[in-house]
Structures are given as structure tokens and as C-alpha cells.
Amino acid sequence: MRIDPFKLAHWMNARKYTAAQTADLAGLPLDDLRRLLGDEANEPDPAAATALAEALSVEPSQLAADAHRNLTVVHKSAEEMHASRRPIQRDGIHFYNYYTLAAPEGRVAPVVLDILCPSDRLPALNNGHLEPAITVNLGPGDINGRWGEEITPQTWRVLHANHGGDRWITGDSYVEPSYCPHSYSLAGDAPARIVSYTAQSNISPLMTEANNWSTGAFEEALKALSGKVSAGSVLDLFLARRAHTRTSAAEAAGVPPADLEAALRSPASETGLTVLRTLGRALGFDYRVLLPADDQHDGVGKTWTTIEDSRRSRRTFGTYEAASMASAAHLPDLVGSFLRVDADGRGADLIDHAENHYVVTEGRLTLEWDGPDGPASVELEPDGSAWTGPFVRHRWHGTGTVLKFGSGAHLGYQDWLELTNTFEPAATLRRGRRDLAGWGYDN
């Protein structure tokens, strides 16, 4: 296992150990530790790596080097995508074929599905998954979607394919929440496919943490979150952690208790915002967490965008023509666009604050990007795909269509909230990136 020198330095600082103390605790020569701090390619024997982890009270994996450093773009040809095909059996029939699109190893990747369940059969539901998703009909046929045991207008709907002259907008799309059971069948005799953009879930770290909690602790958490998370329930948790009641908190903030109760009933009102902001300043918490989400979903959690909705969203973006897929304010990191490319020369630069996943649906397109060793490019045809990292400058040219998806896997809205609270954010990031500075007491 290669040791990441920056992770090693971070944990030495976090544990408040000097290099000499760390080496002594791990039973390593000090010069060996210094070599690990200075050389990313240095790979200690397993016993030394384990000893270092034990000395710093961490798991060895918390010191392991990542394989993704300096990664800018990952791409996959149509042939490579087709080679990833795996047939799925469900309900006694060949139900789907799955194909994986480009993504770095160890990260969530979008998939394309051949829909094979015939139209005269009710498609058997799956169990849902943690990752929310944007699902888009790629055509050429329509698709039946199912989202519940009982068939209702909310649990059964057709995802239409675009049969018009603007087929670069491939079809209907919808946003699907975590753990929503779903399934699809053909809506006629025409074949059909979907792309399922399963994005990284922002609550995935919480679920990983909760897996290690005791059953009693987890049940207490569920009590606090029962029903719809509200300003009052969250505030009560914040106050208990600070040894406050609503009465004492209101007194500390100079707010009448009745005004606080009114603010919790209507947190987004002008008075509610003023009261909660005053309370946050007095007690030291971010009042924005208490504001209600702007939910945009039906009774099973879906948010739908029809072909006509996408057509109405058409606009020029640099050298591209764009149209929107389904989106929802309560899942702000989950984004998707249809992108029409028609540029013989260099296309307009694209540079996003989070990862992008692309899949080509028509034409032969060239993706160019600024790599760590200079300009790079790849030519992709339909079913070719690519992943671009955050803040990687890239562009498309040629004539065709590419579907553009994004998630919050890198710099998501939670990160932006944190950065708005960070003193000198640029300086903090500059210092923290690849930081090998000791904590100041080695000498």
C-alpha cells in the first residue's frame, strides 16, 4: 500500500504528534518517516504501514494514496461501452441489458439500459437504490414506467421518446429520489433505451457513519427526524447541543419567545428570517439550515420534464444549443442538459465546478481538454462517453448531440455552503491542498 504523504501529515497534525513522536510510536526510523512524507512513490512494507496507522489511531485505508491524482478526463469508446453489457434476469425473463459509461474507478457511474420487458407485461419492481438519478428516454420507442405496487397516475406513466424533427432532445426525463422502487417495460413494439444517471448521494457519508452506530443511537436519530424535517425539530437539536432551551435561547438572542415560535412556524417569512438569523448569530449556528426546502416532486418523489418542457427551455450557450432535462431544487447537485454541437472548429470552453458525465447520442464528436501534460483530445461516436473532473477546461466540436450530466461528487452545494462560512476560503484551500507543513513543534 502506498502512503499518501498529505494524509499522513494531516493525521500527524490532527493527533498533535511531531514526526519524531510518530516514528517512535510506530517503531520506525525517523528517516524512513521523513522519506514517506517527501516521496509519494515510496511504498513501505505492510507491517510499517500498519504500525503507522496504529500509532495515529486510524485505519490503514485512511493513509492510503488515491489513484486519481491529476485525473482530468476519463473516456470510453462505444465498443468499450458495448463490451460492458450484462443481461439482467427479473421475473423469469430477460428484463434489461446494462451498460456502464465512463467514470473513474471507485466512483458512481451512469448506465444505459436496453428495455426488454414486453408491453403486455407489468414490469416487476426493483428495490430502489441510495443514489438519486435523472432518467432519460433515449428512444426510439416509448417506455412504461412503474413506481409502486398499486397502479395510479403517479406510479404509472409513459416516458415518451421524441419522434419529431428535433430528436437531439431524445425524450422525457425525470428525477428519481433515493430508494424509490421503479421498473420499466416497452410501451409498444419499438425497441427503447434509457440512460440512468445515478449520481453520488449526498447522504452516503451519513449512511456509512450510521452503519457503525449502535441500534439504540440510530433509533434516537430516527425519532429526531420522524416525519418532515422542520425548523423546530432541527433547532431543538441545535439548542440541546448548546445546553439551551427555546426560552433561554430567545433570551440570549434578545428575541421575545413568541416571536421565536412564530418564526419556526413561518421560517421563510421576512420576520422569520430576521429572528432565525439573530438567533444563529447569538448562539453560533448557520440559520440557513432551518429554512424549508423547495420541494418539487409528486407523491412518490418524482419530478418530471416532458419533451415539450425541454423544447421550451432551448437556448444558445456559447457555440452550443442547450435544452434542460428534469431537475429539482431539493436535489440541486443533480443536473442534466441536452447539448447540440455544431462547430467545425474549436467549440466554446466548458468549465464546471463539479464533475460531468457525457454520452454521445448522435454524430461524431471530438472532446478536447486541458490535461496535466498539455492539450488532449478524443473522438467519440454514438454510445461513446466521457467523464470530466471539476474545473477542467474542455470543449466539444463536430456535428452531433451529447447528453451532459452532473452531480455534487466534488464541489456540491453542501461544499458551497461550507465555503460561504469559511474565513478566507481561497487561502484555506491553497494551504490545505497537498499540505505537508507540520503543526509547528518539530523543532
Curated annotation (Swiss-Prot):
Protein name according to UniProt: 2-hydroxyethylphosphonate dioxygenase
Keyword Oxidoreductase: yes
Pathway linked to the protein: Secondary metabolite biosynthesis; bialaphos biosynthesis
Family: Belongs to the non-heme iron-dependent dioxygenase family.
Keywords carried by this UniProt record: Antibiotic biosynthesis, Dioxygenase, DNA-binding, Iron, Metal-binding, Oxidoreductase, Repeat
Name of the gene this protein is made from: hepD
Cofactor binding note of this UniProt entry: Binds 1 Fe(2+) ion per subunit.
Assembly: Homodimer.
Known cofactor(s): Fe(2+)
Catalytic activity: 2-hydroxyethylphosphonate + O2 = hydroxymethylphosphonate + formate + H(+)
All residue ranges annotated as the HTH cro/C1-type domain in the record: 8-63, 234-290
Root EC class: oxidoreductase
EC number of the protein: 1.13.11.72
Annotated GO MF terms: DNA binding; ferrous iron binding; identical protein binding; oxidoreductase activity, acting on single donors with incorporation of molecular oxygen, incorporation of two atoms of oxygen; protein homodimerization activity
Additional notes on this entry: Mediates the cleavage of the carbon-carbon bond of 2-hydroxyethylphosphonate (HEP) to produce hydroxymethylphosphonate (HMP) and formate without input of electrons or use of any organic cofactors. Reaction was initially supposed to follow a Criegee rearrangement with a phosphorus-based migrating group. However, it was laster shown that it is not the case.
Protein's job: Non-heme-dependent dioxygenase that catalyzes the conversion of 2-hydroxyethylphosphonate (HEP) to hydroxymethylphosphonate (HMP) in the biosynthesis of phosphinothricin tripeptide (PTT), also known as bialaphos (BA), a natural-product antibiotic and potent herbicide. PTT contains the unusual amino acid phosphinothricin attached to 2 alanine residues. Synthetic phosphinothricin (glufosinate) is a key component of commercial herbicides.
Organism lineage: Bacteria, Bacillati, Actinomycetota, Actinomycetes, Kitasatosporales
Portion annotated as DNA-binding: 19-38, 245-265
Highest rank taxon of the organism: Bacteria
